[in-house]
Amino acid sequence: MKKLLLMIIFSIMSTLVTNAAPRSHDPISTQDIAWVGSAGRMTLQFNSGWKFIKGDIKDASHADFVDAQWSTVCLPHTWNNLDGQDGGNDYYRGPAWYRKSFTVPKEFDGKMVFVRFGAAGFVADVYVNGRFVGEHKGGFAAFVFNITGFLRPGETNVIAVRVDNTAPDKSREFQIAPISADFTMEGGLYRRASLMLTNPVHISLTDYASPGIFITQKKVTDKFADLRLTTILSNDSRSAADVVVKSAVYDSEGGVVKEVEARSKVGPYVGNKVDQEMTIKNPHLWNGRIDPYLYKVVVSVYHDNKLVDREEQPLGLRYYRVDPDSGFYLNGQPYKLHGVALHEDRKDEGRAITDADRRQEMRDIIAIGATMIRMSHYQYGQEMYRLCDKYGIVVWTEIPLVNQTVDSKSFSENAEQQLTELIRQNYNHPSVLFWGIFNEIHNVRGPDPLPLVRKLNELAKKEDPTRPTTSASDDEDSTNFVTDVLGMNKYFGWYYGSARDLGTYLDKWHSEHPNRAIGLSEYGAGGSVYQHEELPANQPRTDGPWHPEEYQTEFHEISWKAIESRPFIWFSTLWNMYDFASDSRREGFRPGINDKGIITQGHETKKDAYYWYKVNWNPEPMVHINSKMFTVRDTPLITVEVYSNASNIELFLDGTSLGKKSSEDHRFFWRDVKLNAGSNSVRAVALIDGKEYFDQCWWRFGK
């Protein structure tokens, strides 16, 4: 058996090919093959050699269609990575086609073949060899189709995908969430794709593209963890199958912690659910950033005494609660949830970011000292959830029910579908603690969203009774009292009022609703590293072209102090970690960009506000001089602000000491510093535990 499987792998490497042009094939590399055990399950990356064209092309689904003049692209891919970030709200929204030719080895005969797409924005119709396979509506969840019966083993096969991101107001077909939002609605196959091979009897791949295994943490304490393992089996053969399901939990060293076994009979061409119970004594808990310990669950399926499928899933054991007065508790202990909201976006890449991009994002998140992220406003790629599991980042993840609803059965059903996909695809990630139902649902006038919100909340509870539901609101409305906990999106000091109003608002809300847990799901202000003014900065017009970095910094200083001093705020996620594409925006330094990020859209430059949070959240020694990029000054007398977690800082101007300052809030100020004509060297020095730390910059005054 093992020899045969090795022959199949060699055959795949030799003959599974991609079409760069008609009759011109490049063999897939060994890196494109992910071999899972010896169970007969195989995953082949399906990302290179796609042909692409914008527009609705007649007969593009046909197997013999000539696509030689189309562009060749690799996945992930979007057609809005450039026009979706340049402003004007005129980026292309409509259909486009992807095609790929590949040869299926004859050894695949008898295997089940599935195609999986990480996401497609927003409606995808899939064809294989000219035959319609299926349609998926929704721009952010993975989807899987069984294409076994559409393939011709030993011959060239063609898969064609029509993807459409037409604006909802242009077609009733596209009445799916989100109808509108403050981000570019990019089209494309903007996550990775794969071919997956299994034996006829296997763990299901088509249960809303879930892993087919659900690990329910029924009760977890410091002393024990009661678990239920549910495995969805599929039998795509003509005969009933007697199967044995063996499930094992392994510790991080690879040692077996617990094993259970169950027998089941699966009828032909049907599925079956197998439940298994187990208890783990004295569990090593997943404890966030402190200790993100992970077990591994391995489920093996045997048929006729042969191993026919095997799948692994992460397991992080934890228990938690939210208190309306004292905040969040993880494993019985107070645990501060502070962090960032994100978007899947990067300059010139759009939503087609890579896993390497996600790993860089995680490095930034870890470095700033965040303990939580809000995956706004939609489901993210699986790599981000995996990284959060690994590094102990608590996750709020949500569906794109943003701004408004539509009074139609199809809209409601699709929202339910997207929520089901979100929960089932991410059920086993220990980092995921909260299911988000909606965001700012009253922003656009429309039907009363309350019935749909209630329905979705009930669905989330049915799908997963172990996790709290949550929502992000900017309004005072009855929808605020549907989900288990709540986040408020408040922009005091940006869209209204003063930044100092935030604390007053939070106190009032808590006083009026003492039994309702409240957090901050969004707060932020725009800021450009190319726009500066002397301290103290003036509050700019939000819709104007001037968004100085100094005001953004001051906004976050005031806001964080209001949050930090109120223990009843159960979490806070600032808006946003990165600047991101929102093509309808006409403000700040660059049109088409929401510039509230504390790092630029290209992820290359950290703004001063980033360092404000780092000095508060990360205990590692640091010194940072603010306004570094304010390199040319038009006044000789300036205020210098430095962040540090040292108790004392000494500032030098052109090598001359301007004295030491002390601070209890990480902010150090030198006022009325007189710059010399020409270039000025500024250096801030701290001594922490006997080691010197410093930061340095150069500013010019005069010509």
Locations of the language-model features?
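Short hydrophobic alpha-helical membrane-anchoring segments
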Residues: 11-19, 531, 579
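Secreted/periplasmic carbohydrate-active enzymes, especially glycoside hydrolases
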Residues: 1-10, 18-376, 392-395, 418, ...
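Substrate-binding/catalytic cleft of secreted carbohydrate-active enzymes
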Residues: 362-365, 372-613, 620-639, 655, ...
